[in-house]
């Protein structure tokens, strides 16, 4: 989950 951006998977 990237803040302010599209939700990306945190790895």
Curated annotation (Swiss-Prot):
GO cellular component, one term: extracellular region
Pfam families: Periviscerokin
Entry keywords, A to Z: Amidation, Neuropeptide, Secreted
Positions where Valine amide occurs in the chain: 11
GO BP, one annotated term: neuropeptide signaling pathway
Localization, UniProt: Secreted
Primary location: secreted
Family of the protein in this entry: Belongs to the periviscerokinin family.
Role: Mediates visceral muscle contractile activity (myotropic activity).
Misc. remarks from the entry: According to PubMed:19808072, a longer form of this peptide exists.
UniProt protein name: Periviscerokinin-2
Organism: Bisanthe pulchripennis (Praying mantis)
Organism taxonomic ancestry: Eukaryota, Metazoa, Ecdysozoa, Arthropoda, Hexapoda
